[in-house]
Structure formats: structure tokens, C-alpha cells
């Protein structure tokens, strides 16, 4: 049986943000199992031969930023904003169809673009395509809009219900922790699978020993002092208190 052509879609696959890193890990495992992975986003640092760059899919695209400025922090939106949303949705939908046909995509993996409403036109375009084509889709959710205060007051509740995430039969939803699983079930009646973010301890990154020693020295640490890192924002849902309890449990002054 031939491997699948798998299309990853998001606003950005570049740099070291969590979504980009996790997508890379997934694609590595999928390719090891005989599949081919292709990429659609507004910013890409992937293999150009397997990439479909569309700058208007980026959350920082100027028109999208203007749309966001008009819909968050207020309870209604103007007609001109709705028109702008649908103009961009229509454009992105056409580009997504081109991506599907160009690379003969068998399966979509949508990384957070159906989760956090940073690019609402992209989420709407994806939802319509999935509904129209019934293409098998994995919606990989990293953080939902209700987890961020900036989205709590908005003028797009209709779009949030429609596409963030959409409740469609062809979509399998994946979340990164059990709390998200409980919330998506409670709020939306959607079942999901938990796949935590992972680290490949068998293949650690290459370490520059000189930089490590210099870093330790700058902090006044000895060579054998332990460093405990919590590489997240300081917000409630990151559970920083658990890291504090872990350090306490080490009993290492």
C-alpha cells in the first residue's frame, strides 16, 4: 500500500514556536512510516519542493491584522469587516484547493488554524473545504480561543462557533492535554484524542559546550549545578506551580 500525501496547514511553519516544532516532529514520524508531507502556510522554512507559500495566510498579513483590530475587544462588527473577512476567505479557499490538487493531498493535518482565531478567514476557508470535499482531516489543537483573555470580547461569535473548531464528521480532533480534552467536550460536545507534546530524548539536539559553559558562568553556576527550565509564558494554564513543586521535591539547594 502506497504512503499518503499529507498536507500540513497553518498560518506559519517557521522558527521555534511550539506549533512549528510539533508539526516537524509529527512529519518526521509520518515520513519514517512511508508517507510524504507537504506544507501550506503564510511563512515557511520547509523544503521548497514540498511547500506552498501563501503570505495572506499569515496572521501578520496586513489585511488580517486590520480585521482582527475590528473584531476583538468589541461586541459587534461592521458590514465592511464582514465583507473583508469573506473576500480573504474566498481567496484563501482557492489557494487551498490549488494546494490540495498540486500535491494530490490525501489527508490534512491542520495545526492550530482551526483552534486559535488569529486568521479567521483561513479557518473559515478550511472549514468549507473540509465540508465540501470530505477530505480526512486531523485538527491538531494547541490552544483554544477561550484560553486567552484577548478573545473573550469579540464580534465574531458566529465564526468562532462555525470554525474554531468546526464539528464536522470528517475531522478527528487532537488536543495536547486532558484539560483541553475536557473543555472541548464540555463546551462543544466534541470528542478528542490526547497526544501530548513530546521531546525525542534518543536524538537530542547538538549542544555547543562552550556556549553552555559561558551561560552557566554568566549565571554564577558551577558545572554540576542543575538547571530547571520552564520554557513557557507566565500564564495560569501553563501550570507553572507544578514546576515549582517539582523543584521543591528535588531537595537540592
Place the predicted regions along the sequence by residue.
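Catalytic cores of nucleotide-sugar-dependent glycosyltransferases that transfer UDP/GDP/TDP-activated
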Residues: 1-253
Amino acid at each position: 500500500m502506497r504512503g499518503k500525501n499529507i498536507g500540513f496547514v497553518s498560518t506559519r511553519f517557521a522558527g521555534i514556536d511550539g506549533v512549528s516544532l510539533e508539526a516537524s516532529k509529527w512529519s518526521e514520524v509520518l515520513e519514517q512510516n512511508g508517507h510524504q508531507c507537504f506544507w501550506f502556510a503564510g511563512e515557511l522554512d520547509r523544503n521548497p519542493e514540498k511547500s506552498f507559500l501563501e503570505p495572506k495566510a499569515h496572521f501578520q498579513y496586513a489585511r488580517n491584522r486590520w480585521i482582527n483590530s475590528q473584531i476583538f475587544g468589541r461586541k459587534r462588527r461592521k458590514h465592511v469587516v464582514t465583507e473583508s473577512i469573506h473576500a480573504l476567505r474566498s481567496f484563501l479557499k482557492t489557494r487551498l484547493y490549488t494546494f490540495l490538487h498540486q500535491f494530490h493531498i490525501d489527508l490534512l493535518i491542520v495545526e492550530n488554524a482551526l483552534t486559535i482565531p488569529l486568521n479567521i478567514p483561513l479557518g473559515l476557508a478550511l472549514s468549507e473545504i473540509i465540508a465540501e470535499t470530505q477530505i480526512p482531516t486531523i485538527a491538531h489543537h494547541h490552544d483554544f480561543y477561550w484560553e486567552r483573555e484577548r478573545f473573550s470580547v469579540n464580534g465574531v461569535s458566529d465564526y468562532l462557533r462555525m470554525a474554531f473548531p468546526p464539528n464536522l464528521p470528517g475531522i478527528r480532533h487532537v488536543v495536547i492535554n486532558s484539560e483541553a480534552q475536557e473543555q472541548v467536550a464540555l463546551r462543544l460536545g466534541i470528542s478528542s484524542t490526547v497526544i501530548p507534546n513530546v521531546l525525542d530524548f534518543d536524538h537530542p539536539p547538538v549542544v555547543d559546550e562552550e556556549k553552555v559553559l559561558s551561560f552557566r558562568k554568566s549565571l554564577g553556576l558551577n558545572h554540576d549545578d542543575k538547571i530547571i527550565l520552564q520554557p513557557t509564558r507566565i500564564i495560569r494554564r501553563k501550570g507553572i506551580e507544578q514546576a515549582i513543586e517539582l523543584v521543591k521535591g528535588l531537595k537540592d539547594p
